[in-house]
Structures are given as C-alpha cells and as structure tokens.
C-alpha cells in the first residue's frame, strides 16, 4: 500500500500551518480548513505558528491485504506570541482507505461526538448539594497539572475509559490534586468513583457543570466571569450549541502571554490548547462557557 501518499498529505498540512502555500485537491479542503482555523485563531491572539511537526504511528502489524488502516498522528505546533514560546500538542486518530492495488483512496480524521448519548438525564440540581458532612480539602494544583500533563494522550489503566472521555479525564486530574470524593453510591449525588462505578458528575460534562455550580463541601468551585481569572488546575465547561446542555470539559494547565488559559483535554486529545476552541469542528457562534475556579479550605478561610 502507498503509505508515502499519507506522509505527503500530512506534510502538506504542516507546510500550510506555517504559512507556506500548497497545491491541494477537494479531498484536502476539510483538512486545510482545520489548518486555517488554527492560523486565524493564532493571529487573533497576536501569535503565529512558527514550526509544525507530526509523528505518524502505524499499527504494529498491517495485513498485506488490508484496505482500511487506523493510525495515529501526534502533532506538535510551536507558537510564538511576542517573546513567549510554547508548544501545543494534538493526538489525532485517523483512518486511511486503500484500493486493492494499494493506492490511497481517502485519509480522514476519525471524528468523535462530545456527548454521552447513553447516560441518563435523571439529574436534580438539589441532589448535587448532597447531605454529606463537611469534608476537608487542600487542593494540590501542582499535582493535578502534573497528572494532566502525564495522561493527556494516553489511558491510565487504574481508571475506566470512555469513547467520550473528556470529563472522566478532568475528574482524574482533580482527584490527582487530592480533591475529596463524596456521594457514593448514589450516581446522581456528589462526585465519586468507587467499586467499578461512578457518579454522573465524574464522567458527564453537563453533570460536572451542575456539580461544580452547586457543591458546598468537598470538591467545590467558584464560577468566575472571565477566563483570565482562572489558574492552572481550574476547569472550563463548554456548551457548543448554546442550548443549555454542556457537552465538553477541559483542564487548565498554563496561561499564555495575555494571561489566557491553555488547556489539556481528551476525546480529541490535546495539550496546551487555547481555551476558546474556536479552531474546533464543534465550535458554533452560539457557544457558551462556564469558568470554574476550584476553591479549597485555604481560600475559604
């Protein structure tokens, strides 16, 4: 099979990201649209992508007769924002289709839906308060960010994994910072994972948003008005359609030159991504955000 055709296509994307012109066909248009969104968002922030690389990871074994091959692309984009340099990383799942003669027919990103379709909607705002006694909480932001950096593009075998894994990943990061769990075994109460089960707030973006909006003990947060007020270790929730249903969560790991959050996330695995998601295929003009600053006993006192 002509895997070199895949390399050529990916290389064209990399060239386009760093403002080099490329010759492209109709099949490339959606790919280059993604690149254009990246470049436009960078320009809006008075930044530019100055270098782009990609490591392609093929399956360990590919059958000679295979016509459909799933593979991974790990992108590294170097941004320059004034005198500030940082690297955004993207883990992309792709599928390449070849003819019986080995010619490349198509090569596309495997798009994922952000929303849990199989989870129940039996959530009550009142339940998220819970009736637990006060739980002591000292948040270790450094440990939570270290965890986010370690696992952004892989699965921790000590936790469950979902096709839509964004909120599960954020919950793991919070737990790594010593956030206390409460509410077990009621899935509609508190925030917890135990005995091969978990609360809705652990794994579902909308439920986590409800929990952080109302929790008064244990893991809790203050909703702030703008992203500049967030710190590494905080959480952003996204309602892409603006319909009141939040369907994505990210974890703040750093700030850029303008003091804006850079986030890690899963489902579409990314590291040090600009918080607004204006470069996402899920982005709409109706998008709504909630910015949660995690508070502990030190900030309460």
Curated annotation (Swiss-Prot):
The cross-references to Pfam families, in alphabetical order and at most eight, read: Amidase_6 (PF12671)
InterPro entries named in the record: Amidase_6
Indicate what this protein is called per its UniProt record. Uncharacterized 35.5 kDa protein in gldA 3'region
* Organism name: Geobacillus stearothermophilus
**Organism classification, top ranks?**
Bacteria, Bacillati, Bacillota, Bacilli, Bacillales
